[in-house]
Design a protein with these regions (language model features):
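Short, strongly patterned local motifs
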Residues: 1-20, 27-55
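A generic transmembrane alpha-helix motif of multi-pass inner-membrane proteins
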Residues: 329-383, 390-391
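Selective recognition of specific alpha-helical transmembrane segments in multi-pass small-molecule
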Residues: 133-148, 159-179, 212-213, 238-265, ...
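Transmembrane helix-loop junctions in multi-pass membrane proteins
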Residues: 106-119, 141-154, 172-183, 261-295, ...
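Helix-loop-helix module between adjacent transmembrane segments
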Residues: 58-70, 79-116, 120-144, 298-309, ...
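Extracellular/periplasmic helix-exit of transmembrane alpha-helices
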Residues: 56-59, 171-187, 201, 231-234, ...
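Membrane-interface alpha-helices at helix entry/exit sites of multi-pass transporters
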Residues: 80, 85-97, 234-249, 325-334
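Membrane-interface loop-to-helix entry segments
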Residues: 95, 103, 116-122, 126-176, ...
């Protein structure tokens, strides 16, 4: 059940990640087609990283005395890796501590992205001030945290239904605008590799933004997903790894492509200068009228709860690694996440993304370094699993 809740939470992050692919400042403008090209190129080959994630966390997890079941993640397999190298037991190891701290920073940033996106969408759809939306989100999220089990069961049903609806609405939009598809792909490659962009340094900016949003959306390599996946009970670690590798493809290539096509099929002049939920909802209003704006607002509202539950689940094992098995520290981080949820709803759009980008960037650096020595374990488990399937 916990793994299902995490996977449901990822759906919301796909929409947030792709809708954030347009960013402006006074020096440069990064267009959605160009960023989407780099976004998909970076995200086309991340499944192997996800598989290598899930094998180590299944092999290096431990029992959770607070919540029951198991816990793990990069902080734990990094710790075991350093201990094996030093050949002595230690309470903390610096790389694992740095990963845990970076993770907690990142998930606070994601809390802000959630509320910022929902507040913006509710303002566009219902003219509700962001302050009121932020207060409502904090109150409802606090109730979810206190009654998590019942709520996760509801979300396990609601979120997949909303994701399917989102997918089929996108197919409808594509079918209606089928003649524009060739020109959309022409724009993608033209704005990604055009001489003007390369001469102005825009190529590097587009690549950087596509990488950041791609990493944010599917998390492959960052080390966040294994924090929750360690709780999964399976007879072979390879099964969890293969499922996650497929999940990365579905999450990114399917869900994020849906969001991108909605935006790119809208007239360029209509969405020029917009970003985030303003960009996505303006495009939806062009395609489906007021219904499209309201649908995105309600969809993101439901996705936000699953995403918030997911990041709190990610944080459990890292808080326990840093501060031990004490409920007071678990509760303190939940309160901090709720505070960041409130701040994000009324903060500037670029600020909330920057905090999440810093955290997830640091997480990825520490985690990727640790994955290389552990790759042998993952490959050995995969070969063993394949041989068992043949016999």
């Amino acid at each position: 059940m916990q793994l299902h809740g995490r996977q449901a939470g990822e759906i919301g992050e796909q929409v947030f990640g792709c809708a954030g692919n347009k960013k402006q400042n006074k020096h440069q403008q990064i267009q959605p087609p160009a960023a989407f090209d780099k976004f998909q190129r970076i995200d086309f080959f991340p499944g192997n990283k996800s598989f290598h994630h899930f094998d180590p966390q299944q092999l290096h997890k431990e029992e959770d005395p607070l919540y029951g079941g198991y816990r793990g993640g990069p902080a734990y397999y990094i710790h075991d890796l350093v201990e094996d190298h030093l050949k002595k037991k230690k309470r903390y190891v610096l790389p694992a501590v740095l990963f845990a701290i970076a993770g907690l920073i990142c998930w606070c940033g994601i809390s802000q992205v959630i509320s910022n996106s929902v507040a913006s969408s509710f303002k566009n759809a219902f003219s509700i001030p962001p302050l009121y939306t932020s207060i409502m989100l904090v109150i409802l999220s606090a109730i979810i945290v206190l009654r998590k089990n019942a709520t996760v069961k509801v979300l396990d049903f609601i979120v997949p239904v909303m994701a399917v609806c989102y997918f089929f609405i996108t197919l409808f939009i594509i079918a209606v605008n089928l003649r524009q598809i060739p020109s959309v792909f022409a724009r993608i490659f033209e704005e990604a590799f055009g001489l003007r962009q390369m001469a102005a340094g825009g190529f590097g900016a587009v690549l950087m933004n596509g990488v950041k949003r791609g990493l944010f959306s599917n998390e492959a390599g960052s080390g966040s997903a294994p924090c929750a996946a360690a709780a999964a009970e399976c007879d072979r670690p390879a099964k969890a790894g293969l499922v996650q590798a497929l999940g990365v493809f579905v999450d990114t290539i399917v869900i994020c492509s849906c969001t991108a096509m909605i935006m790119l099929l809208a007239p360029k002049d209509l969405i020029n200068g917009l970003s985030g939920m303003d960009l996505l909802q303006t495009a939806m209003q062009y395609h489906l009228g007021k219904f499209g704006v309201i649908f995105i607002a309600l969809t993101l509202f439901l996705f936000s709860f699953s995403t918030f539950l997911g990041i709190l689940f990610y944080a459990r094992s890292n808080v326990a690694y840093l501060f031990g098995d004490k409920w007071c520290f678990q509760t303190a981080y939940k309160v901090l996440a709720l505070v960041m949820l409130f701040i994000g709803g009324i903060a500037a759009y670029t600020f909330v993304w920057d905090l999440g980008d810093v955290g997830i960037g640091l997480m990825t650096i520490f985690n990727i370094i640790a994955l290389y020595p552990l790759a042998g374990e993952a490959l050995s488990e995969l070969k063993s699993y394949e041989e068992s399937k043949k016999s």
